[in-house]
Amino acid sequence: MCSRSVALRWGAETLATAGIEQARREARQLLAYALGITPEALVRDPEAELALGEYQGLVHRRAGREPLAHIVGRRGFWTLDLAVSPSALIPRPESETLIEAALQAFPDRTQVRTVLDLGTGTGCLLLAALTEFGGAFGVGVDLASEAAAVAAANARQCGLHGRCAFIAADWAESIEGGFDLVLSNPPYIPSGEIAGLAPEVALHDPLAALNGGTDGLTAYRRLLPNLPSLLNPGGVAIFEL
């Protein structure tokens, strides 16, 4: 047994030694997760005692470079709290720029009635877009049926399941046109560079969500020719690069 403050200090030191950049913040998140409380609640009683067992296991997993999101099973994106899975790319903060770009493209949010998300993963882009374009219906497509299932579960959790559908398909091959907004974060890492990525990415994100082929542009060559048939007149496509 030890106090929360001692456990937190040990966790932060262990993660820092393992090369985790935000060691104290992540140690705090793991301790809160182990206790079933919020990180903010930790400060209310820092000297409360706890058994280290579960927390030690979580810290060692993170020190082994397993992503924090996989350990706690969740990741925030835009205004949403989403479930994550090894079958889908962990949502990145930088992908929120696609939602920002969509809002700039359509200052009148009633203009967007249909949204397509190609390579939906957790559904983060589509679900975030639906929270902003309140009258829209969305379709999310992913090659991995497991990822499509995660996205559908996130839609239910967010109360958006009545406004979207998720399907497992090879990009847009089974999709007919008629979309005002097309979003996509396709794989764009050149094949030869994947091994040099952070272990959290190279070893834990699905390879299909990373591998952009020899030059990183394979998916774009597949997708771009389909855009004219997918977009409504005045429609906009926004891709992460």
What are these language model-derived features?
Residues 102, 129, 201, 223-227:
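Class I S-adenosylmethionine-dependent transferase superfamily signal
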